């Protein structure tokens, strides 16, 4: 069984506005290309992601779309029980819909938010329950995913059976060109 942890920038870190922002289309296109390649090679069974607004929710949406054509499952993991409870009503509804559509969802801490320890335990869980990670993240432009990136890099020094794939800004620019070219062909 092959499992991938997907994370990356939050929507506000990328300056996205609304669900129809062209940046979101390009990011989802890039994620879809990565996942499709793994699926075609028989190297992916589960997408395991968080529920942060941004790359994590967009990757879950891509996984749900790919699930229609591939034997792919989606797990949404939360770092604590009441994750998202302070979000706007619309964003809480998005989270609930995502949890309803996932094959599995749970929280790594069964308690409400208490502090940074819950995020470290979440990272540890995600790392231990996946075989590789895909981060839409560029170390030259730090964001909240910096902590996931640094933790994975640290563990890669000890584990050679884990793989980290980065989709950085250069990759996103290339994905935008590819997407635009594919749209012209249609």
UniProtKB/Swiss-Prot annotation:
Annotated organism of origin: Lactobacillus delbrueckii subsp. bulgaricus (strain ATCC 11842 / DSM 20081 / BCRC 10696 / JCM 1002 / NBRC 13953 / NCIMB 11778 / NCTC 12712 / WDCM 00102 / Lb 14)
Lineage, top ranks: Bacteria, Bacillati, Bacillota, Bacilli, Lactobacillales
Family of this protein: Belongs to the UPF0398 family.
Any one Pfam family match given in the protein's UniProt record, by short name: YpsA
NCBIfam families referenced in this protein's UniProt entry, alphabetically: PRK13660.1
Source species, domain of life: Bacteria
Protein name in the entry: UPF0398 protein Ldb1014
HAMAP family: UPF0398
InterPro entries: YspA
